[in-house]
Curated annotation (Swiss-Prot):
Residues 33-641, 690-733, 839-853, 915-922 are lumenal. Residues 1-11, 663-668, 755-817, 875-893 are cytoplasmic. It comes from Homo sapiens. One of its GO terms (biological process) is positive regulation of ER to Golgi vesicle-mediated transport. It is a multi-pass membrane protein. Belongs to the GPI inositol-deacylase family. Residues 775-799 are annotated as: Disordered. Gene3D superfamilies: alpha/beta hydrolase (3.40.50.1820). This is GPI inositol-deacylase. Residues 782-793 have a biased composition (Basic residues). Signal peptide: none annotated. Keywords: Disease variant, Endoplasmic reticulum, Glycoprotein, Hydrolase, Intellectual disability, Membrane, Protein transport, Transmembrane, Transmembrane helix, Transport.
Length: 922
């Protein structure tokens, strides 16, 4: 019956929208590289020693605990406190375990063993009872206060030691990183208790799903504090994102705000981290061996030899993090590296005058210095590029200042080099170094190993090539191509007009090589100059390689840099690069960045259909099918223009002042614009997806009611349609009071769920009664509903009354179907707090704070009355016309204020439901 109310064109549209949504979801959940993280292993059995907390503290936080990680002999030795190492505190995230510390703890222990425990780290971990803090924000403040107490407890464990620490380093995974940042907002917290903060896959900008006001209030408090106190915050902070493999927390949310006064913060995607170069999912980021090795190396380089603790020098801390996480020159970190190096010893000096040079070193018996005079090359070329496949940490490239072909001392240019997976390379613009006379490449004596060194001089215009990307709406039907015929080692393709998050492309690189015996490796690198989100692809030539191009962070308005596609190639190969729009990945970006707003658009569509049903009941006396009204009423032009106009007017000072006087919250569209998340036509696209979801959810709820009614009839004897309509049955006040007491004493979401189940039961019972009645009547397909009404005037009065009741029951079921759709979304949005309450029931019987309690007090009696409401009882209501007018502005309000604040949706939904219930009395 539900499907019969939709024409074939609309049905085809809904199926097509499902297809588009499937493409977008597939790109988000499956359209990324395979997991290239190596598993980190424990070489000894891991042990978690529980740290005894003060009794008052343990009583105040019965669900929380503090542990010290250890293995083997280290664990045995440190069971007897106090400790002697450097304290690091690990904070797990949403549903995270304190045992997630074992990967980095084990690697740090092995590193300490390698240096005979000259320095070592003590890794502590907090047990938050695997709380779902990403879904329920009421415990975030409690976690923050507990961590503060843990820090003080940890520092007491080192009392009396010669090099006792005065602060701890913190590693926060997921929401644990946000809790760590929130420590600074506590009144009694001393900022110098934290010397370093590293967060992994932490959504710093905004919550992934703002399901209650406690989460958004917590974010507002933390971010506002960091912005307003940026000048005084001296905490070195590193945020590492997982990249596209992490579909739970998109990387754009992990980037710390770039503040003019707070320069001690870095944000990077794991695919851009040197010696890591892989994307991680939300869980593997804590055990990915490549990333944990990088983190541990950074920790050991941060140690101050004098204090045997992490350095207090902010500049050094930032330099270490930059060295390991942003740009690695393939050298061990040095705080003050020597710029001038001695080039002495018994070495051979070879003069090279050609512009392109390759040297294959194998079993070299003596050191060789190859010198390249720069004077003549400056006249012809603009840049010099050198690379080496020997990935040791020794200096390998220098420059002479004197004019001779040999120099006793040279400028060490190795610090300006950069490490890639298979090479280390250096690119210099010659005009930036006018005082240099010679370039010197050093080849050490090697035994049993082989490596290749290449150098070439080139003109910028020959290697920096502009490649405009294809238009967004080309849908992959057109492409742009560049053919690289020169035998260069390095190319820079400037991807013009590529800077928005809604853009997505596929680049295909075809390499064709001349006959070579050895395997040739090429590296393709997407470099984003406005954020550290580079990604690398290694390809063997000859080959055809397809690479995805999409962004985590949009290009800032005042940034004029261009995204680059860097190619580290072979001179024996020719390359052909083709770029075209990827429609499926564009849909993926829509889902990735705006999928969380979909519930708001679904509810907006249902409200519009609900309005149509109420108005048809007022104007014609009958309620039309939900699907029919959805098709008729759910139009984007009824909602979007109002939001666009309000956003436009907010640009004027007088309107903004009026807006603030009315105490209205900030428009969600303005928030999205500030986060550079506004797609062209994004609201229209989401509205259409919302219409599709509203249709299929309506179909599902209608089918579920029919199925449940069939089961009811199979289990219970048939029931009759009610002849006496009673809005308030004798048991209704008692049931309402009981549910309100449940809400007050336990959890508001539980009471809402029970009320919802009661409402569904009443609807199922009505459906079963109607089915029983229809089965007991003779079938006459020739008569329509109107003809039945007309003919019934000539029949027995009792039968006339029953037929009217049957028609009214059908109308009531249509209305109830829409109300169930609305209530279902309220229940779904309240479920996180219910799940949290059930998980912590052994510690707390009453959820406090409870985001659903105020809503439950209003919704429980409303649902109780609506469950006993029939359309015949409200047709003549004076309030019906007013009630039918409310859903339209509320549908606009849902989009304006609920797309980025999902917890506001129930507030917009219960208003028309409450008015609907009041129609029974007015």
């Amino acid at each position: 019956m539900f499907l019969h109310s939709v024409n074939l064109w609309n049905l085809a549209f809904y199926v097509f929208m499902v297809f588009l949504a499937t493409l977008g979801l597939w790109d988000v959940f499956f359209g990324f590289e395979e997991n290239k993280c190596s598993m980190s292993y424990m070489f000894e059995y891991p042990e978690y020693q529980k740290i005894e907390l003060p009794k008052k503290l343990a009583k105040r936080y019965p669900a929380y605990e503090l542990y010290l990680y250890g293995e083997g002999s280290y664990a045995e030795e440190h069971k007897i406190l106090p400790l002697t190492g450097i304290p690091v505190l690990f904070l797990p995230g949403n549903a995270g375990s304190y045992k997630q510390v074992r990967s980095i703890g084990s690697i740090a222990l092995r590193k300490a063993e390698d240096i005979d425990f000259k320095y070592h780290f003590d890794f502590f971990s907090v047990n938050f009872n695997e709380e779902l803090v990403a879904l329920y924000g009421g415990s975030l403040q409690k976690q923050t206060k507990f961590v503060h107490e843990c820090i003080k407890t940890i520092l007491k464990l080192y009392k009396g030691q010669e090099f006792a620490p005065k602060s701890v380093a913190i590693i926060g995974h997921s929401m644990g990183g946000l809790v760590a940042r929130a420590l600074l907002t506590l009144k009694n917290f001393k900022h110098d208790l934290i010397n370093l903060l590293i967060t992994q896959a932490t959504p710093h900008v905004a919550p992934v799903m703002p399901l209650d006001r406690f989460i958004t209030d917590f974010y507002t408090t933390v971010n506002n504090y960091w912005i307003l106190n940026a000048r005084h915050i001296n905490l070195t902070t590193l945020s590492v994102a997982g990249g596209f493999r992490d579909y739970q927390v998109r990387s754009g949310l992990t980037f710390l705000p770039k503040l003019s006064h707070h320069t001690s913060a870095l944000s990077v995607v794991s695919s851009a981290v040197p010696k890591t170069w892989v994307s991680t999912d939300h869980l593997s980021i804590v055990w990915c061996k490549q990333l944990q090795l990088t983190t541990v190396r950074a920790f050991f380089d941060l140690i101050d030899a004098d204090t045997k603790q992490i350095t207090q020098n902010s500049k050094k801390k930032l330099s270490v993090l930059y060295h390991h996480f942003i740009r690695h020159p393939s050298k061990h970190f040095e705080e003050n590296p020597a710029i001038i190096s001695d080039l002495t010893g018994t070495s051979m000096w070879v003069l090279v005058k050609v512009s392109k040079w390759t040297y294959v070193a194998y079993n070299e018996s003596e050191k060789i210095y190859f010198t390249f005079p720069l004077e003549n090359h400056r006249k012809i070329y603009t840049h010099v590029y050198c690379q080496s496949t020997m990935l040791d940490t020794n200096s390998w490239i220098f420059a002479c200042i004197n004019s001779t072909s040999m120099c006793l001392q040279g400028v060490d240019l190795s610090w300006k080099a950069e490490l890639l997976p298979t090479i280390k390379y250096l690119t210099l613009r010659l005009q930036d170094y006018p005082s240099l006379s010679h370039l010197v490449v050093y080849v050490p004596s090697v035994r049993g190993s082989k490596f290749v060194v290449d150098c070439e001089f080139f003109k910028k215009e020959k290697r920096y090539i502009q490649l405009p990307v294809t238009h967004l709406f080309s849908f992959g039907l057109s492409s742009r191509k560049v053919v690289l015929n020169t035998n260069g080692l390095y190319y820079n393709l400037e991807l013009l007009n590529f800077g928005q998050i809604y853009q997505a492309f596929k680049i295909n690189v075809v390499s064709k090589c001349s006959a070579v015996k050895e395997e040739i490796t090429s590296i393709y690198r997407l470099h984003i100059p406005w954020s550290y989100e580079d990604s690398l692809t290694i390809a063997q030539a000859p080959s055809s390689t397809e690479i995805s191009l999409k962004l985590h962070i949009a290009q800032p308005e005042n940034n004029t840099h261009v995204a680059l596609f860097k190619m580290y190639t072979s001179s024996d190969c020719r390359y052909e690069v083709t770029v075209k729009t990827s429609f499926s990945q564009i849909l993926g970006q829509v889902v990735r960045f705006h999928g969380g707003a979909l519930p708001a658009y679904v509810v907006s569509n249902i409200l519009l259909a609900y309005r149509g049903q109420l108005y048809s009941l007022f104007s014609t006396g009958c309620c039309l099918e939900y699907a029919t009204m959805l098709d008729k009423e759910a139009k984007p032009y009824k909602v979007d223009p109002f939001v666009i106009i309000i956003k436009f007017l907010l640009g004027y000072k007088w309107f903004k002042e009026l807006w603030d006087v009315l105490l209205l919250p900030e428009l969600d569209a303005v928030i999205l614009t500030c986060q550079s998340m506004c797609f062209p036509l994004i609201s229209l696209i989401l509205f259409l997806f919302g219409t599709c979801t509203a249709y299929w959810s309506g179909l599902l709820s209608s089918a579920s009611v029919r199925l449940l009614s069939s089961l009811w009839l199979a289990l219970k004897r048939p029931s009759e349609l009610p002849k006496d309509i009673k809005m308030i049955s004798p048991d209704l006040p008692f049931l309402t009071i009981v549910l309100i007491i449940v809400s007050w004493t336990t959890c508001g979401a539980l009471a809402i769920l029970l009320s919802y189940l009661y409402y569904v039961f009443k609807v199922v019972h009505l459906q079963a009664s109607l089915t029983t009645f229809k089965n007991s009547q003779p079938v006459n397909p020739k008569h329509s509903r109107r003809s039945e009404k007309k003919s019934n005037h000539h029949k027995d009065s009792s039968i006339h009354h029953l037929r009217l009741s049957a028609n009214d029951a059908e109308d009531s079921l249509r209305m109830h179907s829409t109300v169930i759709n609305l209530l279902t979304w309220i229940v779904l949005l309240s479920m996180p707090s219910l799940i949290y309450w059930l998980k912590n029931l052994r510690y707390y019987f009453k959820l406090n704070p409870d985001p659903c309690k105020p809503l439950a007090f209003i919704l429980i009696p409303t649902m109780a009355i609506l469950g006993n409401t029939y359309t015949v009882s409200i047709k003549s209501s004076k309030l019906l016309k007013t009630t039918s007018q409310f859903p339209l502005p509320l549908a606009v309000g849902v989009i304006a204020f609920g797309s980025a604040h999902l917890y506001r949706l129930p507030c917009f939904v219960f208003i028309p439901l409450l008015l609907h219930a009041l129609c029974n009395f007015m």
